[in-house]
């Protein structure tokens, strides 16, 4: 069992009968969704899933997990998702899988969020992983120029075919290569106020628990209340 599978299975233990569960996206979240699907089938676990991408929706439906959209539920009890980086003070960068907008919407309306990662994702400071910024296609080149002038080293994300990537929401992604983010809240606020920016991959003050995979087993970190 690899570290991603280990934390995915561990996180699925927190899912209880009757819950509305946000199902994350990505290589680690995939194992969590598989385990929830197994529990639905083998244990009779009764939940409703809310997916964060078309990719996860397809996986969950194939596993027989009942689904509703975020607009069909009053709230989400628990969201479990991966992360690309988690800092020492439990702030995160997400969006390497291009699902950041829907992931952030589901997380925002969740009572509790668990992030599942292998040990390599735990860092002192955010920024070594490129920061995704989801933008409206119209005017996106202007934002690239703006970010270049700011010294953010932007790149427009491409898909496997080498064409401009289109997100599930119909947007583009500009990745910012920042190396180190000294003030995530200030940067997040700046990006929030830019015309044409739909969302960014800074997930600040959102997570309740982090499950980290190590060779000797998963370690659960409880995030202090903010």
From Swiss-Prot:
Positions annotated to bind substrate: 25-28, 81-84, 94-97, 121
GO biological process: D-ribose metabolic process; pentose-phosphate shunt, non-oxidative branch
Active site annotation, chain numbering: 103 (proton acceptor)
Key word Cytoplasm present: no
Catalysis performed (reactions): aldehydo-D-ribose 5-phosphate = D-ribulose 5-phosphate
Keywords linked to the UniProt accession: Isomerase
UniProt KW DNA-binding keyword: no
Record-linked InterPro entries: NagB/RpiA_transferase-like, Ribose5P_isomerase_typA_subgr, Ribose5P_isomerase_type_A
GO molecular function: ribose-5-phosphate isomerase activity
A single Gene Ontology CC term: cytosol
E.C. numbers: 5.3.1.6
Pathway(s) this gene product operates in, as recorded in its UniProt entry: Carbohydrate degradation; pentose phosphate pathway; D-ribose 5-phosphate from D-ribulose 5-phosphate (non-oxidative stage): step 1/1
Subunit structure: Homodimer.
PANTHER family referenced in this protein's UniProt entry, alphabetically: RIBOSE-5-PHOSPHATE ISOMERASE (PTHR11934:SF0)
UniProt xrefs under HAMAP family: Rib_5P_isom_A
Stated family: Belongs to the ribose 5-phosphate isomerase family.
Function noted in UniProt: Catalyzes the reversible conversion of ribose-5-phosphate to ribulose 5-phosphate.
Protein name stated in the entry: Ribose-5-phosphate isomerase A
Organism: Enterococcus faecalis (strain ATCC 700802 / V583)
Gene name of the encoded protein: rpiA
């Amino acid at each position: 069992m690899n570290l991603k599978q280990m934390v995915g299975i561990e996180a699925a233990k927190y899912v209880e009968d009757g819950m509305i569960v946000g199902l994350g996206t990505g290589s680690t979240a995939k194992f969590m969704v598989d385990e929830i699907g197994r529990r639905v089938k083998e244990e009779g676990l009764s939940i409703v899933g809310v997916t964060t991408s078309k990719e996860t929706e397809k996986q969950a439906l194939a596993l027989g997990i009942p689904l509703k959209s975020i607009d069909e539920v009053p709230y989400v009890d628990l969201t479990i998702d991966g992360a690309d980086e988690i800092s020492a003070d439990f702030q995160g960068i997400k969006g390497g899988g291009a699902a950041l907008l829907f992931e952030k919407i589901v997380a925002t309306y969740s009572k509790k969020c668990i992030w599942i990662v292998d040990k390599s994702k735990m860092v002192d400071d955010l920024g070594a992983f490129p920061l995704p910024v989801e933008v409206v296609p119209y005017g996106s080149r202007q934002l690239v120029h703006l970010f270049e002038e700011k010294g953010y080293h932007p790149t427009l994300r491409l898909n496997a075919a080498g064409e401009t990537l289109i997100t599930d929401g119909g947007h583009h992604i500009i990745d910012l290569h920042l190396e180190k983010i000294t003030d995530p809240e200030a940067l997040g606020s700046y990006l929030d106020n830019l015309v044409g920016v739909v969302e960014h991959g800074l997930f600040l003050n959102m997570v309740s628990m982090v499950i980290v995979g190590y060779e000797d087993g998963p370690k659960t970190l409880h995030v202090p209340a903010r």
